């Protein structure tokens, strides 16, 4: 998949949203190293085989680890208009019962249900799954998660890491998109300066200053718009 122009960016974003919140149930299996070590690959295969065999209108996706490795394999089940349900310690023998419940719009087997997520702040975007199931705890009410604020790992366990469209759907690359749309180098440099982003080589020189010096420098490459500055950590 290539994004060859700015207009295509919005199209890709809509395509990603349609995957995260499709008009049919979505089941996501955590197949990070911890999940795979506890049999998640077998669970994913069982879901795939059973969905195909029954001809079910269910979207299946592999995702990473949500963070509760001791409870793997974790499986997220979402039915349109309802909270996302996080299931734990799911094994292949649970798959039929889960799919039966999803097909009927019922709650999955009680022994597999850990908590619910009604909405999620990806920081770069906000997703509302749905509301309901008052008897279930919210994810942040689970003792292990209580007090946690997910920042760097906020997307783990919810997005398919191999699908860039899903990342774009929740605001991924939005800063780059804004820069390309606005096409105002001076404003971009001022924003970087205001953020006080700096190098880590020892001198701690401000990145915004480096970019400003580069932009002001004379040279044929700059005037052709081919100059590029990289701030590596």
Indicate where each model-derived feature is located.
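Feature of Fe-S/electron-transfer and energy-metabolism proteins
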Residues: 1-233
């Amino acid at each position: 998949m290539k994004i060859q122009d700015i207009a295509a960016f919005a199209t890709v974003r809509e395509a990603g949203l349609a995957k995260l919140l499709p008009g049919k149930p979505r089941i996501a299996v955590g197949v990070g190293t911890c999940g795979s070590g506890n049999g998640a690959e077998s669970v994913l295969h069982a879901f795939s085989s059973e969905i195909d065999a029954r001809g079910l209108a269910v979207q299946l996706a592999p995702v990473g680890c949500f963070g509760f490795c001791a409870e793997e394999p974790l499986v997220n089940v979402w039915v349109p208009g309802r909270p996302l349900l996080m299931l734990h310690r799911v094994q292949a023998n649970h798959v039929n019962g889960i799919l039966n419940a999803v097909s009927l719009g019922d709650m999955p087997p009680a022994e597999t249900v850990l908590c619910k997520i009604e909405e999620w702040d990806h920081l770069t975007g906000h997703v509302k799954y749905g509301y309901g199931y008052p008897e279930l705890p919210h994810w942040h009410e689970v003792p292990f998660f209580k007090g946690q604020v997910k920042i760097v790992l906020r997307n783990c366990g919810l997005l398919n890491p191999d699908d860039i469209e899903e990342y774009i759907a929740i605001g991924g690359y939005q800063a780059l998109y804004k820069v390309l749309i606005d096409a105002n180098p001076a404003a971009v440099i001022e924003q970087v300066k205001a953020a006080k982003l700096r190098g880590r080589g020892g001198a701690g020189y401000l990145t915004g200053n480096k970019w400003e010096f580069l932009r002001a420098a004379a040279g044929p490459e700059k005037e052709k718009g081919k100059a590029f500055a990289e701030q590596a950590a």
